Amino acid sequence: MPDFAKIDKKSVYTTIIGLFLMAVLSLTKIIPELSLSGLTVLIGILFFFVLEHFDKKSHIESGLRFKSFFDDLKKQGVILLVLLPVGTAAATLLIGDMIFKGAFASHILGRTDGMLSFDKIPLLMVQIVIAALGEEIAWRGFFLGKSMRILPFWLCAILSSLLFAIAHISSGSVGLVSYDIFMIFVDSIIYAMIYKKSGNCLISALSHIIGNATGILLLMMYS
């Protein structure tokens, strides 16, 4: 358990405010007419860098490290976890196609069509990188990384992954949507484990990019 006597109160209060805002914004996804879930990433990034500023004064190691990227990648078990979303992306599409008879691929395309330019490959590659990096800074770097200072890891991992999955809800049948957000939850748990082991959201971002790129490539081949 964290030693609360050693935690800066300003950082704790700032973290709680950021967590609350991200949670509320994610939950608005349940009501399509009210959905403001797209703001969760912006809020998470903002609070991440505010807390990084506080941490720098306290000489606390950053959760976004370029210089130690390769050293963090080589930490025990990290590379295997980074590559795991390649398998989950393929399995998600294969199982989804078997269960929903092609409707799952259409559902994913519909969910991502407004954010990704499938007809412009160079732009699509940039969008995949930016989207994954932004989500990792917000959800792993801030929500998971900063909340882990005041709460147990697995509680933070499950809560952040649940909200992350809810923020990706898209219209469709109950079964289709439930399967989609469950697999997003699974991937999010993997990213959380990567962050826990590496302490660097650039590493979880790499895994996120690889996983998304694999899924999109398979979708384009399938379509």
What are these model-derived regions, one by one?
Residues M1-L73, A89, L93, D97, ...:
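N-terminal, membrane-interfacial amphipathic/helix-forming hydrophobic leader that caps
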Residues D3, I7, K29, E33, ...:
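Membrane-helix interfacial "entry" motifs
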Residues I7-T15, L36-V41, D72-L81, D119-L124, ...:
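Residue-level signature of transmembrane alpha-helical entry/exit and packing/kink sites
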Residues T15-A23, V41, I45, L81-A90, ...:
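Alpha-helical transmembrane spans of integral membrane proteins, capturing the lipid-embedded, hydrophobic core
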Residues L25-S26, L51, K56, T92, ...:
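Membrane-water interface at transmembrane helix exits
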Residues E33-T40, S106-D113, L176-V186:
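Non-cytosolic membrane-interface motifs at loop->transmembrane helix junctions
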Residues E61-A131:
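Juxtamembrane helix-loop-helix connectors linking adjacent transmembrane helices
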Residues F118-S223:
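Transmembrane helix-loop-helix hairpins at the membrane interface
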